[in-house]
């Protein structure tokens, strides 16, 4: 693991989005999903909910299975954190769930999904909502595939249709609707981030 750790910032929210780990550029940008995969993720959310990246970053708590960039794999792609690294960071996610008491958690990608549902095929979980428990909290869980350009899963069938269904479930969830209707204000008089 390569410091510094990356988090989404001090946002109190009933919605937590959980990613795998920061990529190589996120520590420089000081925010999760700061590069190509993030652009795709925020486009998905904007199309489904109407919320911009700025509004989502201000209203959703961004967490990760691992807090630091895990380094590169021999293939040149980002290395998947190993079980010991995941165990070392698990207390952070547990504590965040204890403190925030989310109503909705959105795990993004296989590694994040596995932390809640075990190892499974994406076809078995994307497009579905689950009631889950962790760290003393009960919440709804709506998984998303990783938005990486390296994986075509979300671009082809059945992935494309399952992703659309998952985004519908997220947009229709009461916790997400509450965020959308919260009237978040941007800096400056009369500016609103949310419709």
Regions found by a protein language model. Name each.
Residues 185-187:
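Short polybasic linear motifs
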Residues 1-179:
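A polyanion-binding, active-site-adjacent surface
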């Amino acid at each position: 693991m390569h410091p510094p750790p990356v988090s989404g910032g001090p946002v109190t929210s009933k919605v937590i989005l959980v990613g795998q780990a920061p990529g190589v550029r996120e520590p420089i940008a000081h925010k999760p999903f700061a590069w190509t995969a993030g652009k795709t993720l925020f486009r998905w959310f904007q199309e489904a909910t109407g919320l911009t990246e700025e509004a989502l970053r201000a209203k959703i708590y961004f967490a990760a299975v691992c807090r630091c960039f895990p380094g590169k794999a021999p293939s040149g792609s980002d290395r998947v954190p190993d079980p010991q690294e995941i165990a070392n960071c698990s207390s952070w996610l547990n504590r965040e769930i204890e403190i925030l008491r989310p109503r909705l958690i959105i795990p993004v990608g296989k590694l994040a999904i596995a932390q809640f549902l075990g190892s499974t095929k994406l076809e078995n979980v994307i497009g579905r909502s689950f009631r889950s428990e962790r760290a003393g909290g009960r919440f709804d869980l709506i998984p998303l595939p990783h938005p990486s350009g390296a994986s075509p899963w979300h671009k082809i069938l059945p992935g494309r249709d399952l992703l659309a269904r998952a985004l519908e479930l997220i947009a229709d969830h009461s916790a997400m609707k509450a965020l959308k209707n919260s009237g978040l204000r941007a800096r400056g008089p009369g500016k609103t981030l949310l419709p």
